[in-house]
Amino acid sequence: MSKVIGIDLGTTNSCVAVLEGGEPTVIANAEGNRTTPSVVAFKNGERQVGEVAKRQSITNPNTIMSVKRHMGTDYKVEIEGKDYTPQEVSAIILQHLKAYAESYLGETVSKAVITVPAYFNDAERQATKDAGKIAGLEVERIINEPTAAALAYGLDKTDEDQTILVYDLGGGTFDVSVLELGDGVFEVRSTAGDNRLGGDDFDQVIIDHLVAEFKKENGIDLSKDKMALQRLKDAAEKAKKDLSGVSSTQISLPFITAGEAGPLHLELTLTRAKFEELSAHLVERTMAPVRQALQDADLSASEIDKVILVGGSTRIPAVQEAIKKETGKEAHKGVNPDEVVALGAAIQGGVITGDVKDVVLLDVTPLSLGIETMGGVFTKLIDRNTTIPTSKSQVFSTAADNQTAVDIHVLQGERPMSADNKTLGRFQLTDIPPAPRGVPQIEVSFDIDKNGIVNVRAKDLGTGKEQNITIKSSSGLSDDEIERMVKEAEENADADAKRKEEIEVRNEADQLVFQTEKTLKDLEGKVDEEQVKKANDAKDALKAAIEKNEIEDIKAKKDELQTIVQELSMKLYEEAAKAQQAEGGANAEGKKADDNVVDAEYEEVKDDETKK
């Protein structure tokens, strides 16, 4: 069976890993980094992904960041006259990760396990699966990020029974899960979280502080200046990271904007204490889901054996201090918070291929599922934190006499009224025989698969007629749309490969022009003028082709010049060989002359002896 890669598709950074020899390994990207920024940019029809896209984000308005925050919504971003959905943008990132995984493995990759925040609802999970499909990946399993982290942490500890709390603070989402490990079984007891809280919010409080301080000093609001704002964002992210290791950091942004008197600079010292004051409300916001997860698992903080921190933002000292205070436990530092989720996904990939044995993963559904019943009430069929896969049925009836159809409104959430919860979908069961209200028996069944994706069925028990739906959100893509996007993604991948080949051909041509000039210089006066002219003409023809940027012409002219340069190089070697021979002959003559020399014996006479 081909390799199944594990992908942590993050809000700010993504990571890919694979199981090799029973051990999960993070695959470094082309720049040698183990994580890749989840950033996509478009420039003159060309797509850029990762570090290169992030670097030019200040000057390129066609840059998309943190798209994960919009998964499962009808959000679209218009770039160069085309609308892109979050699924398409995520697919571009996944294609990039897939490409460098293939380069590392030396084989085609078609299967993946992709992680999502534990608190992702059905629409967000479905959107992630669609993104994988568009990228040309068969998504074997969608697993929760904290669960993946627990897999990576606990793989070599499955013989010990322990309860662990995974605190996952990523770039844009926050999750906490309580799991029990033992006998190779990873069972999720509870999960809670906030999909609108992450490292980006910690950056934002620093940005707001910088904007306020600059406005106080100079009377100019930098938040209205797009270019300045991007520089502030980069500086805030760097300051946040610096303050994890030092107690104060200097933020220096020269020429941030211009005032009436000329250019203005931003110079400010940010202390860790000030940052902790600015972000205290965010740290406190993460504590409510921790308490909720413990309560749902029916555990006290003292019953937790280990706390695992996941996500780059858990390096913030105030976050570590808060979790220690809440649980009474020092967080486990044996895993890299940026990589552990991808490693866990790779292990799950190994479970699927059979490379990892005796490991069973029992995940849970993060939110309750049910339908709308009379009076707009939300009737739960499956409670949150139910182990998946699972199914549940309940019999309902009609609300009015002679009702021949029922609308099934499927919802996900925890609020008692339907209007306050998330609509997953609607469908209708028709042709119910007319009868007094309360007589027809309508069985509604919910089925959640191992990826957390929901199927709902309604059946009239009297007639046996049934209707079912695989839940797709209002923003969900139809099969035709997905197929179109898959095709476009493949075409773009081909275009990217063609563009790469063109760049390589141009680079080789430039190198050949330089090499030709060097060879001609070395052969000056050693070959006849006709050969030199022939080489110069071919070189000029290649330079002209490079200027016109006609790839086929560049290839042809490059091959012509290559042949001439090879002939000239042969001349150069011949000249060198002749010179060596001549030198060898001269040495031999010198040797013959040396043969006539007679060695004479001599006796040293000391001065004191001659004086006697």
From Swiss-Prot:
Residues annotated as carrying Phosphothreonine in the record are 173
Family, per entry? Belongs to the heat shock protein 70 family.
What is the protein's species of origin? Bacillus velezensis (strain DSM 23117 / BGSC 10A6 / LMG 26770 / FZB42) (Bacillus amyloliquefaciens subsp. plantarum)
Q: Does the keyword Glycoprotein apply?
A: no
Amino acid composition bias (Low complexity), ranges on this chain: 578-588
In terms of InterPro entries, this protein maps to: ATPase_NBD (IPR043129), Chaperone_DnaK (IPR012725), Heat_shock_70_CS (IPR018181), HSP70_C_sf (IPR029048), HSP70_peptide-bd_sf (IPR029047), Hsp_70_fam (IPR013126)
What gene codes for this chain? dnaK
One matching Pfam family: HSP70
Function description: Acts as a chaperone.
Region (Disordered), start-end ranges: 576-612
Q: What induces it?
A: By stress conditions e.g. heat shock.
Superkingdom, natural source: Bacteria
Q: Which portions of the chain have biased composition (kind: Acidic residues)?
A: 596-612
Protein name per UniProt: Chaperone protein DnaK
Q: Which GO terms describe its molecular function?
A: ATP binding; ATP-dependent protein folding chaperone; unfolded protein binding
Record's keyword terms, sorted:
ATP-binding, Chaperone, Nucleotide-binding, Phosphoprotein, Stress response
